[in-house]
A protein has these predicted regions:
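Bacterial N-terminal signal peptides
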Residues: 11-23
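Bacterial N-terminal signal peptides that target proteins for export
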Residues: 2-12
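Short, motif-level signal for alpha-helix interfacial/capping segments enriched in acidic residues
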Residues: 35
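Bacterial Sec-dependent signal peptides at the C-terminal "C-region" and cleavage site
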Residues: 20-32
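Non-catalytic cap/lid and distal C-terminal segments of serine-dependent acyl enzymes
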Residues: 27-28, 38-73, 78-381
Length: 381
């Protein structure tokens, strides 16, 4: 290509870029820039105080809720003369938090923040407060595994199902069969939640890079394949368990390089997923070596039904053959704390052996991420 042709090519490219830039600035003919166009919705000061803002000039009330607040419920924002609503809270400890705005009673996500958590009930925003305490979930210069969204046909459901699957760094070169951790979300979330709000893949990357855990495949399924959140006693009426054992496990074991014995399987779940973990330990103990319910426990009426209808299951000696039955809670402010204590009392009554753990951050992903940091290194040893 001669010099003139190169110059013409450069000028043409520059003209296209300028044209697109002009369109981007103008947006639409006659449109005017608003304070919201240049708004930075999250500002974190040196002392870790967080200011959240949203442009809503016609709103009469705006609140924000999230797990960075010290209590449940929303915090009111104040409106300035430009129509920007803001609130400053903190200092906020370094970690990853979710939040939602409510504008005149309507939940809205932050339009200036592309970091979101996908859930069964919609989207929430994510906000990272940097600092040493948040190092465990940081995206570091270490080997990274792959996080895949996988769609497959589930015969028991008669439809296609989605699952998130993590494979460790260098998976393609690993010849040995790998163990599998099935990692279940809670009632308001879906199969993406452990990867977004949970940051599971980055946490596992960091633990592997530090030599703290064994390589494993992590399967994050959707936990509500039926009509919704099922919390009844037993497993017969919930389509999840048929889906899990007849569709999901066979798919994973036929498409990935994994071991198929109980010693190669672990199951962990939070909240609703924790109830499913409890059921796995009680009704399917021969299928797993590790069962880890997080921030959960049976409701009082379910405990009574369990004791009346499923005595033989609670007395099953296979339960105590689990290498680990690990029940973790988010401290006394965890909304499932009382149910968890009552469930442990039932286990004590039937001689079911278990270990306990607590991270005092309540019923939040802050607790569950730290749970993952603690239990992942224990598995498959």
């Amino acid at each position: 290509m001669n010099r003139l042709a190169k110059q013409l090519k450069f000028l043409l490219a520059a003209g296209i870029l300028i044209s697109f830039s002009t369109v981007g600035l103008a947006q639409f003919p006659g449109a005017k820039l608003t304070p919201g166009d240049t708004l930075k919705s999250i500002r974190i000061s040196a002392d870790k105080k967080v200011t959240l803002s949203i442009y809503a000039p016609k709103a009469s009330e705006v609140t924000v809720s999230g797990d960075f607040l010290q209590s449940y419920g929303g915090q009111k924002l104040k409106k300035d003369e430009l129509g920007i609503w803001s609130v400053t809270v903190g200092p906020v400890a370094p970690d990853l938090y979710s939040y939602d705005f409510s504008v005149d009673g309507m939940k809205v996500i932050d339009p200036k923040n592309i970091q979101v958590k996908e859930g069964a009930g919609g989207y929430s925003n994510l906000m990272e407060v940097p600092g040493k305490e948040a190092d465990y979930l940081a995206v570091k210069n270490v080997p990274h595994g792959n996080l895949e969204k996988v769609w497959f046909y589930a015969g028991t459901l008669g439809k296609t199902s989605r699952v998130h699957i993590y494979t460790p760094p260098g998976y393609e070169k690993i010849k040995d069969k790998l163990p599998v951790l099935y990692l279940q979300h809670g009632g308001g979330d879906n199969d993406a939640s452990w990867a977004t709000a949970g940051r599971a893949n980055f946490i596992l990357d960091n633990l592997l890079a530090e030599g703290k855990m064994k390589p494993m495949i992590v399967v994050m399924p959707f936990g509500n394949p039926g009509s919704g959140f099922f919390s009844g006693a037993g497993v017969e009426a919930d389509p999840y368990y048929s889906y899990f054992f007849k569709d999901l496990v066979p798919y994973v074991e036929s498409h990935y390089n994994v071991g198929t014995s109980r010693e190669n399987r672990a199951y962990a779940g939070l909240s609703m997923g924790g109830l499913q973990a409890l059921n796995m330990g009680i009704f399917y103990p021969e299928k797993f070596a590790y069962v880890l319910p997080l921030s959960t426990g049976f409701f009082p009426e379910i405990l009574q039904s369990m004791e009346e209808k499923y005595t033989s299951n609670l007395k099953n000696s296979e339960i105590n053959k689990l290498k680990l039955f690990w029940i973790a809670m988010g401290g006394e402010k965890d909304i499932a704390y009382k149910n968890g204590e009552n469930t442990k009392a039932l286990f004590d009554k039937f001689g079911i052996k278990y270990q306990t753990n607590s991270y005092p951050a309540g019923h939040t992903f802050i607790t569950w991420r730290h749970n993952l940091v603690e239990f992942a290194p224990i598995l498959f040893r």
